[in-house]
Amino acid sequence: VFELPSYEQVAEWQHNQTGIPGQVRVLSDICNYIATESKSDTNVYWSVENNGIGEAALIVINDFGEENIPGLFVSEPIRKGHVRKFRKGFNTTHGTKITACSRLKTMVENDKMIIRSKPLIGELKSFIATGSSYTAKSGAHDDLISATLLALRMMEVLKDWDPRVYNTFNQTEEFEDYTKITHDKDEPNLIIIKGTSTEYFEARRRISKIVRKSSL
Protein backbone atom coordinates (compact mmCIF):
# COMPACT_ATOMS: atom_id res chain seq x y z
CA VAL A 1 0.00 0.00 0.00
CA PHE A 2 1.50 3.33 -1.09
CA GLU A 3 0.47 6.89 -0.30
CA LEU A 4 0.46 9.40 -3.14
CA PRO A 5 2.01 11.74 -4.07
CA SER A 6 4.74 10.96 -1.49
CA TYR A 7 5.25 7.40 -2.88
CA GLU A 8 5.71 6.20 0.68
CA GLN A 9 4.85 2.63 1.60
CA VAL A 10 2.36 2.67 4.46
CA ALA A 11 1.20 -0.94 4.71
CA GLU A 12 1.75 -4.47 3.45
CA TRP A 13 0.04 -7.84 3.64
CA GLN A 14 1.63 -11.12 2.60
CA HIS A 15 0.51 -14.71 3.06
CA ASN A 16 1.14 -17.36 0.42
CA GLN A 17 -1.30 -19.89 1.85
CA THR A 18 -4.44 -17.76 1.64
CA GLY A 19 -6.75 -18.66 -1.23
CA ILE A 20 -7.90 -16.05 -3.73
CA PRO A 21 -11.33 -15.56 -2.05
CA GLY A 22 -9.50 -14.83 1.20
CA GLN A 23 -7.12 -12.45 -0.56
CA VAL A 24 -10.03 -10.49 -2.01
CA ARG A 25 -11.61 -10.23 1.45
CA VAL A 26 -8.32 -8.89 2.84
CA LEU A 27 -8.15 -6.39 -0.04
CA SER A 28 -11.67 -5.27 0.82
CA ASP A 29 -10.77 -4.93 4.52
CA ILE A 30 -7.70 -2.81 3.69
CA CYS A 31 -9.70 -0.53 1.39
CA ASN A 32 -12.45 -0.23 4.01
CA TYR A 33 -9.89 0.72 6.66
CA ILE A 34 -8.32 3.40 4.45
CA ALA A 35 -11.73 4.79 3.48
CA THR A 36 -12.83 4.89 7.13
CA GLU A 37 -9.65 6.55 8.39
CA SER A 38 -9.58 9.10 5.57
CA LYS A 39 -13.37 9.59 5.78
CA SER A 40 -13.57 9.21 2.00
CA ASP A 41 -13.33 6.45 -0.58
CA THR A 42 -12.71 8.78 -3.53
CA ASN A 43 -8.94 8.64 -3.08
CA VAL A 44 -8.65 4.88 -2.69
CA TYR A 45 -7.35 2.97 -5.72
CA TRP A 46 -6.81 -0.74 -6.11
CA SER A 47 -6.22 -3.30 -8.86
CA VAL A 48 -5.09 -6.83 -9.74
CA GLU A 49 -3.30 -8.54 -12.59
CA ASN A 50 -5.72 -10.01 -15.13
CA ASN A 51 -3.55 -12.80 -16.53
CA GLY A 52 -2.42 -16.03 -14.89
CA ILE A 53 -3.78 -16.35 -11.35
CA GLY A 54 -5.17 -12.84 -11.75
CA GLU A 55 -7.90 -14.20 -14.00
CA ALA A 56 -9.25 -16.18 -11.07
CA ALA A 57 -9.13 -13.01 -8.96
CA LEU A 58 -11.38 -11.24 -11.48
CA ILE A 59 -13.96 -14.02 -11.16
CA VAL A 60 -13.85 -13.84 -7.35
CA ILE A 61 -14.14 -10.03 -7.41
CA ASN A 62 -17.16 -10.32 -9.68
CA ASP A 63 -18.78 -12.80 -7.28
CA PHE A 64 -17.79 -10.75 -4.23
CA GLY A 65 -19.15 -7.58 -5.81
CA GLU A 66 -16.81 -4.84 -6.98
CA GLU A 67 -19.18 -2.35 -5.39
CA ASN A 68 -18.41 -3.91 -1.99
CA ILE A 69 -14.75 -2.87 -2.22
CA PRO A 70 -14.31 0.87 -1.49
CA GLY A 71 -12.39 2.96 -3.99
CA LEU A 72 -11.79 2.70 -7.70
CA PHE A 73 -10.74 -0.45 -9.55
CA VAL A 74 -7.92 0.87 -11.77
CA SER A 75 -7.33 -0.72 -15.18
CA GLU A 76 -4.76 -0.10 -17.88
CA PRO A 77 -6.01 1.97 -20.82
CA ILE A 78 -7.01 0.13 -23.99
CA ARG A 79 -4.03 0.28 -26.34
CA LYS A 80 -4.33 1.14 -30.00
CA GLY A 81 -4.81 -2.02 -32.04
CA HIS A 82 -6.05 -3.99 -29.01
CA VAL A 83 -8.20 -6.83 -30.33
CA ARG A 84 -8.92 -8.92 -27.25
CA LYS A 85 -11.99 -8.40 -25.12
CA PHE A 86 -11.34 -5.72 -22.50
CA ARG A 87 -10.69 -7.03 -19.01
CA LYS A 88 -10.30 -4.97 -15.88
CA GLY A 89 -6.93 -4.84 -14.17
CA PHE A 90 -3.46 -5.00 -15.69
CA ASN A 91 -2.04 -7.51 -18.14
CA THR A 92 1.60 -8.31 -17.36
CA THR A 93 3.88 -8.98 -20.31
CA HIS A 94 7.64 -9.10 -20.74
CA GLY A 95 7.62 -5.51 -21.97
CA THR A 96 5.44 -4.09 -19.19
CA LYS A 97 7.52 -5.91 -16.56
CA ILE A 98 10.81 -4.52 -17.90
CA THR A 99 9.40 -0.98 -17.98
CA ALA A 100 8.04 -1.25 -14.44
CA CYS A 101 11.32 -2.76 -13.16
CA SER A 102 13.28 0.08 -14.71
CA ARG A 103 11.01 2.66 -13.09
CA LEU A 104 11.20 0.92 -9.70
CA LYS A 105 15.00 0.88 -9.91
CA THR A 106 15.10 4.57 -10.80
CA MET A 107 12.71 5.62 -8.03
CA VAL A 108 14.46 3.60 -5.32
CA GLU A 109 17.96 4.71 -6.37
CA ASN A 110 16.93 8.37 -6.38
CA ASP A 111 14.93 8.22 -3.13
CA LYS A 112 11.68 8.96 -4.95
CA MET A 113 9.98 5.93 -3.39
CA ILE A 114 10.16 5.19 0.34
CA ILE A 115 10.18 1.47 1.17
CA ARG A 116 9.30 0.60 4.78
CA SER A 117 9.01 -3.18 4.50
CA LYS A 118 12.00 -5.30 5.51
CA PRO A 119 10.64 -8.34 3.60
CA LEU A 120 10.32 -6.21 0.44
CA ILE A 121 13.84 -4.84 0.89
CA GLY A 122 15.04 -8.43 1.28
CA GLU A 123 13.36 -9.41 -2.00
CA LEU A 124 14.88 -6.41 -3.76
CA LYS A 125 18.36 -7.52 -2.68
CA SER A 126 17.89 -10.88 -4.40
CA PHE A 127 16.10 -9.52 -7.48
CA ILE A 128 18.59 -9.66 -10.34
CA ALA A 129 18.82 -9.14 -14.08
CA THR A 130 18.58 -12.44 -15.96
CA GLY A 131 18.98 -12.20 -19.70
CA SER A 132 16.64 -9.48 -20.89
CA SER A 133 14.43 -9.59 -17.79
CA TYR A 134 14.53 -9.51 -14.00
CA THR A 135 13.78 -12.35 -11.61
CA ALA A 136 14.47 -13.54 -8.07
CA LYS A 137 17.60 -15.58 -7.37
CA SER A 138 17.19 -19.33 -7.07
CA GLY A 139 15.37 -20.11 -3.83
CA ALA A 140 14.21 -16.51 -3.34
CA HIS A 141 10.78 -14.97 -3.89
CA ASP A 142 9.53 -11.85 -5.66
CA ASP A 143 5.84 -11.73 -4.69
CA LEU A 144 6.15 -8.37 -2.93
CA ILE A 145 8.15 -6.94 -5.83
CA SER A 146 5.44 -8.05 -8.26
CA ALA A 147 2.85 -6.27 -6.13
CA THR A 148 5.01 -3.13 -6.09
CA LEU A 149 5.42 -3.26 -9.87
CA LEU A 150 1.63 -3.41 -10.18
CA ALA A 151 1.35 -0.38 -7.88
CA LEU A 152 3.78 1.51 -10.12
CA ARG A 153 1.71 0.69 -13.19
CA MET A 154 -1.36 1.99 -11.36
CA MET A 155 0.52 5.21 -10.57
CA GLU A 156 1.31 5.64 -14.25
CA VAL A 157 -2.42 5.60 -15.00
CA LEU A 158 -3.25 7.84 -12.04
CA LYS A 159 -0.80 10.53 -13.15
CA ASP A 160 -3.21 11.40 -15.97
CA TRP A 161 -5.99 11.95 -13.43
CA ASP A 162 -4.24 13.73 -10.57
CA PRO A 163 -1.90 16.69 -11.23
CA ARG A 164 -0.03 16.04 -7.96
CA VAL A 165 0.84 12.52 -9.08
CA TYR A 166 1.62 13.78 -12.59
CA ASN A 167 4.17 16.29 -11.31
CA THR A 168 6.01 13.90 -8.99
CA PHE A 169 5.90 11.03 -11.49
CA ASN A 170 7.33 13.21 -14.25
CA GLN A 171 10.15 14.34 -11.97
CA THR A 172 11.08 10.69 -11.60
CA GLU A 173 10.99 10.14 -15.35
CA GLU A 174 13.55 12.91 -15.76
CA PHE A 175 16.11 10.61 -14.14
CA GLU A 176 15.49 7.89 -16.74
CA ASP A 177 17.22 7.53 -20.12
CA TYR A 178 20.64 8.96 -19.35
CA THR A 179 23.56 6.94 -20.77
CA LYS A 180 25.05 8.42 -23.90
CA ILE A 181 27.17 11.55 -23.51
CA THR A 182 27.64 13.83 -26.51
CA HIS A 183 28.98 17.35 -26.96
CA ASP A 184 26.70 19.88 -28.60
CA LYS A 185 28.47 21.33 -31.66
CA ASP A 186 27.16 24.86 -31.12
CA GLU A 187 27.63 24.84 -27.37
CA PRO A 188 30.87 22.94 -26.55
CA ASN A 189 30.22 23.18 -22.81
CA LEU A 190 26.70 21.78 -23.18
CA ILE A 191 26.57 18.01 -22.77
CA ILE A 192 23.53 15.91 -23.66
CA ILE A 193 23.10 12.85 -21.46
CA LYS A 194 20.91 9.87 -22.30
CA GLY A 195 20.56 6.38 -20.86
CA THR A 196 19.94 4.72 -17.48
CA SER A 197 19.65 6.48 -14.14
CA THR A 198 22.66 4.60 -12.75
CA GLU A 199 24.89 6.05 -15.42
CA TYR A 200 23.32 9.48 -15.03
CA PHE A 201 25.34 10.14 -11.90
CA GLU A 202 28.50 8.79 -13.53
CA ALA A 203 27.83 11.19 -16.40
CA ARG A 204 27.40 14.08 -13.97
CA ARG A 205 30.75 13.19 -12.39
CA ARG A 206 32.39 13.24 -15.81
CA ILE A 207 30.73 16.58 -16.60
CA SER A 208 32.22 18.08 -13.44
CA LYS A 209 35.69 16.98 -14.55
CA ILE A 210 35.19 18.51 -18.01
CA VAL A 211 33.95 21.80 -16.54
CA ARG A 212 36.91 21.96 -14.14
CA LYS A 213 39.39 21.35 -16.97
CA SER A 214 37.77 23.97 -19.21
CA SER A 215 38.03 26.57 -16.46
CA LEU A 216 41.79 26.10 -16.06
Regions found by a protein language model. Name each.
Residues A129-T168:
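Acidic, Mg2+-coordinating catalytic module of metal-dependent nucleases/exonucleases
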